[in-house]
Amino acid sequence: MSREITREELSAAGVQYGHQTKRWNPKMKSYIYGVKNKNHIIDLEKTITHLNAAQKLLEFLGSKQQKILFVGTKRSGKNAVKEAALRSGNFYINNRWLGGTLTNLKTILIRIKALWEIEEEEKKGRLSLRTKKEQIKILKEKAKLEKALGGIKQMHKLPAAIVVVDPKGDEIAVKEAKKLNIPVIAICDTNADPDMVDYVIPGNDDLQESVNLIINILVEAYAEGAQIKMNPSVLRTVAPKREPRQINRPVMSSENQAEQQTSVANENVQMTNEPVVQVAEVEKPSEPKAE
């Protein structure tokens, strides 16, 4: 059984911090707790619930020895997806997504074969028999292929699921997976479109600590199902003691604090007239008006 997730660890990683309210996607309103200084605060209870669902899927896929593709091409996810894949024997893409990676896998496999052939030529010493000019050209091609395909060069068939750090930034990857009915698990910040994702995980996708923690929770679930022992993650999962995206703590009188203060993972959330989701006393958001 996958490990229990606590609000405290999610809060320490900064998972709750969403984007500025003006940058939100209204489809994410059911995952939002409130607003703090014009920034949305994500409901961590929803995050835990959806993480639990994703854990169950990955644990099941692991038990069937199915392979997963981790996708994180934005800075906050590059290290997390690579580490997760290497620790669990899965695949990753942390540079630009090549169109057709899933939908045109046959062509991608041809390019992967070219990478293997260059590596084989190096290994057997045949590369050194070529001219310097040829060697330079071949090694440049190898570096290019390794950067684009190094994380999937062992992937000979479609993955059973993909885990995406930013479904908005890696929209092409998500669309390809959906077209092929491959389940999509994704961290959805408040500016994301959850309709494109099968397993929505509401959370901050910009803080490395937030991404590291969520990806680590997911890969641990896979390892649990696959019954493999992984090395501990070396990535940090506790955010610096500052609030990301310049979210400043609201200054309120003690009287107003008593009336307005609510807690989201020990953080003061300022309730404003910005659209927010009803959670306890939080006002429901109004639908966006047509222009």
From Swiss-Prot:
CDD domains: RPS2. Residues 251-270 have a biased composition (Polar residues). Disulfide bonds: none annotated. GO terms for biological process: translation. PROSITE patterns: RIBOSOMAL_S2_2. It comes from the Bacteria. Belongs to the universal ribosomal protein uS2 family. This is Small ribosomal subunit protein uS2. The gene is rpsB.
